């Protein structure tokens, strides 16, 4: 078969296969071009899920008439000169417009700010027509009709009009978060109109724009992030642990203003929340990374959704450290969604439906309380109510019973004891975040009162978090006890993996794992963490080698130790069904206030909810 040059149309269609996957890909490229042109208003109109019509209108700088033909030619751009590593624009490859024109009917109209009239060019299946004069306000309009008509096989892979329209909306929202000073609007026959008014610049404007996308509730449950390390700056907002979602669709990451889908960034985000939310839940976050363009490669893929950092360990450490610090400094704070859910449940059941119903035989009457027999009361004793009077009940794996308690059994963990001063005035306690304990219901929930709210605490979940944090602090305060192996276990690894693992030997030793290099391609394991008991040493070493190769950290071993501590905390905390004295309840509340992350238990569930007095008054029609 003879080797020959491909035609320009075929080349563009091949490029379109990489850049233009669906209608949303077209919108992404066109909106990014509008932003690069300095637009402050961008309007998007679609029809047929974008397969029939896509139109993007902006008020940017425009394109001169003599450059319109170049704009729809491959590898022609105004955003890049001779340094491919110094990329400061969203677009730079010069492939989007010619790729779109090769698989659709493209019309490009533009009028520069200083021009008296506009001009347009048309590209149909890769064939150029124009330029010619046209009536147009200042700015640019790009209209794409019959997408993929020139490559009908691609249409078979399109989803329904509704799904494609939703994908377009998601793309505009994702881009819009990073540019709050720009007004975005979406309209069309296949959608409900949507608009994001400009909010300005700065952190407050960004949070307001995020609220337009994620809803007002995010702002009420968000923590600000602002940290910098070695020339890399991280800013943005993350949700408190109890404000989480069932999927990762509410996670947004930007590198120098560019929306990215980078698994390393989202992996670091997951790691920062590793022990404060459940494994099947996902944090809500909007993160902005700003760094020298020379330190990141955005030219990994034509779609520019993936990036490659020169120092990935630095980026991961910055993200994990900054978020963990923000969570620790946030104090005790519940998600507003918990209280909202309770209020909605009250409103859904209501009281009106019950007013006309016949009264049950055992219902309340004014005199019934006088003749009702007293409710039976269970006997209380310090052994049943006071966790400090009993050892941790480690009903878990044998390794926990035999090794875990031996290693951490002497750790002083928070207990719901009577440390609170009985003489302390309730008024002073009511001024504290969790207030003063007023009652315990069903031997599981503590009802507390603050100056302007009612707080309900899950005593087991709350104390479980307190014990877990105490055990974690003990793990980090001193080296973990190791258990010597009678015969060292030899693990064969690739030579580079063995060298990397041996380089982390000192860190691993702090966690009770003694390793040393045994020849060019092997690791000798002489000691394992005592609290882990019997374990698959071969698998552990290989997993650690993979983690060090990818992230340059050995967090996997730390996570295993934390998991053991979490199990011990679960079995060593105040159990449900235990009656507590008022002093003990107040002591638990004070410990919660002093412990970072105590708003959620080890499994990610909330430890308490708070109902504002104003909301309670609304339930009773007082407001």
Swiss-Prot record:
PROSITE patterns reported for this sequence: DNA_MISMATCH_REPAIR_1
Region (Disordered): 353-389
SMART domains: DNA_mis_repair, MutL_C
Compositional bias annotation for Polar residues: 353-368
Function: This protein is involved in the repair of mismatches in DNA. It is required for dam-dependent methyl-directed DNA mismatch repair. May act as a 'molecular matchmaker', a protein that promotes the formation of a stable complex between two or more DNA-binding proteins in an ATP-dependent manner without itself being part of a final effector complex.
Family: Belongs to the DNA mismatch repair MutL/HexB family.
Designated name of the protein: DNA mismatch repair protein MutL
Source organism: Brucella suis (strain ATCC 23445 / NCTC 10510)
């Amino acid at each position: 078969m003879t080797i020959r040059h491909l035609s320009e149309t075929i080349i563009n269609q091949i490029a379109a296969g990489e850049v233009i996957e669906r209608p949303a890909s077209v919108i992404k490229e066109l909106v990014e071009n509008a932003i690069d042109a300095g637009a402050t208003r961008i309007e998007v109109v679609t029809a047929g899920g974008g397969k029939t019509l896509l139109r993007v209108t902006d008020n940017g700088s425009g394109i001169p008439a003599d450059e319109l033909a170049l704009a729809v030619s491959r590898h022609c751009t105004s955003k890049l000169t001779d340094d491919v590593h110094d990329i400061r624009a969203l677009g730079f490859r010069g492939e989007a417009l010619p790729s779109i024109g090769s698989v659709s009917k493209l019309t490009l109209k533009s009028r520069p700010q200083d021009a008296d009239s506009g001009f347009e060019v048309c590209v149909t299946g890769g064939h150029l027509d124009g330029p010619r004069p046209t009536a147009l306000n200042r700015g640019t309009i790009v209209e794409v009709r019959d997408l993929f008509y020139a490559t009908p096989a691609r249409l078979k892979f399109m989803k329904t009009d509704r799904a494609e329209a939703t994908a377009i909306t998601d793309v505009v929202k994702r881009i819009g978060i990073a540019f709050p000073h720009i007004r975005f609007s979406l309209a069309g026959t296949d959608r409900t109109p949507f608009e994001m008014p400009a909010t300005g610049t700065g952190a407050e404007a960004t949070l307001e724009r995020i609220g337009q996308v994620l809803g007002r509730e995010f702002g009420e449950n968000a923590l600000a992030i602002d940290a910098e390390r070695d020339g890399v700056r991280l800013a943005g907002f993350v949700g408190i642990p109890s404000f989480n979602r069932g999927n990762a669709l509410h996670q947004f990451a930007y590198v120098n203003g560019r929306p990215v889908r980078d698994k390393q960034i989202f992996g670091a985000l997951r790691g920062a929340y590793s022990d404060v939310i459940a494994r099947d839940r996902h944090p809500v976050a909007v993160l902005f990374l700003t760094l020298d363009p020379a330190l990141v490669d955005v030219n990994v893929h034509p779609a520019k959704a993936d990036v490659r950092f020169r120092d990935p360990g630095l980026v991961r450490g910055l993200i994990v450290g900054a978020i963990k610090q923000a969570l620790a400094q946030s104090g005790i704070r519940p998600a507003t969604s918990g209280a909202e859910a309770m209020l909605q449940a009250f409103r859904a059941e209501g009281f009106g439906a019950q007013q006309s119903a016949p009264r049950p035989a055992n219902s309340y009457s004014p005199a019934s309380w006088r003749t009702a027999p007293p409710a039976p009361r269970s006997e209380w004793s310090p052994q049943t109510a006071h966790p400090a009077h009993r050892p941790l009940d480690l009903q878990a794996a044998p390794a926990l019973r035999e090794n875990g308690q031996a290693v951490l059994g002497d750790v002083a963990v928070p207990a719901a004891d009577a440390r609170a001063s009985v003489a302390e005035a309730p008024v002073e306690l009511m001024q504290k975040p969790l207030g003063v304990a007023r009652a315990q219901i069903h031997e599981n929930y503590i009802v507390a009162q603050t100056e302007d709210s009612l707080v309900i605490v899950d005593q087991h979940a709350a104390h479980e978090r307190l014990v877990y944090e105490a055990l974690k602090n003990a793990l980090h305060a001193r080296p973990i006890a190791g258990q010597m192996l009678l015969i060292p276990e030899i693990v064969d690894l690739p030579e580079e993996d063995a060298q990397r693992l041996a380089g982390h030997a000192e860190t691993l030793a702090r966690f009770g794992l003694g390793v040393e290099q045994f020849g060019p391609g092997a690791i000798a394991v002489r000691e394992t963490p005592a609290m882990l008991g019997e374990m698959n040493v071969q698998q552990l070493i290989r997993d650690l080698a993979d983690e060090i190769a990818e992230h340059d950290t050995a967090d996997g071993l730390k996570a295993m130790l934390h998991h053991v501590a979490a199990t011990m905390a679960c079995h060593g905390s105040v159990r449900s069904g235990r009656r507590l004295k008022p002093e003990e309840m107040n002591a638990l509340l004070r410990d919660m206030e002093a412990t970072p992350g105590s708003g959620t238990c080890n499994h990610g569930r909330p430890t308490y909810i708070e109902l504002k007095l104003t909301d309670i008054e609304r339930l009773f029609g007082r407001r």
